[in-house]
């Protein structure tokens, strides 16, 4: 569609591309789509931190306005157990580096990633990152382990005990309650993996979202999305 106003770059971490090459791609896209307002892409910790501030600013000047970034968890214990390869401080540094270049961040947290034993640590430390950075969008999705990675996951996370949907609802509730952001955040929990779909703006809609989760606990299976209709 030549009238497209938003474009997402590929389905991989394009920030790993040499900056000069990526800028050429961005310029080509702008010529092909003259009404373009936003270009977005995935970004990993390593590739963002490997860019200089000047490089990120040049990318922003060429309409790379938004980076999708997986926080997953703010707990260093959990990050180590899942072999994320980064620390919570590096996650904060990554977000700050993007936002300091006026590139917006859409971040994700994975509910249930710490299992039952690390649930509270997972939530408190994840909320700490949100409260100490300036992301624009926040999404939560629910952990789903494909058969191809299950064995590897449990081998590195030997004390993992899976959370039920009700555990996840409680985790989501506490996470929302703990969020006191610097700026308004557009919040979505509408990924296909989620037992309950939510949307709102934080902190304005915090109470409304908490109440929706309380209702879902009372109504149970009447409102929880059946597993057969979910995707991970």
PLM feature spans:
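Catalytic cores of alpha/beta
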Residues: 54-56, 114-132
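Short beta-strand segments at enzyme active-site cores
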Residues: 4-10, 68, 105-109, 138-144, ...
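Conserved strand-turn element in the central/C-terminal portion of the radical SAM core barrel
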Residues: 46, 70, 74-78, 98-122, ...
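Conserved SAM/AdoMet-binding glycine-rich loop
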Residues: 1-100
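Alpha-helical structural signal in soluble globular domains
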Residues: 24, 28-32, 58-62, 97, ...
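Aromatic/hydrophobic pocket-lining residues that form the small-molecule binding cavity
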Residues: 22, 52, 91, 123-126, ...
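Auxiliary Fe-S-binding modules of radical SAM enzymes
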Residues: 128-232
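Short, hinge-like loop/turn segments at secondary-structure boundaries
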Residues: 58, 85-87, 124-126, 156-158, ...
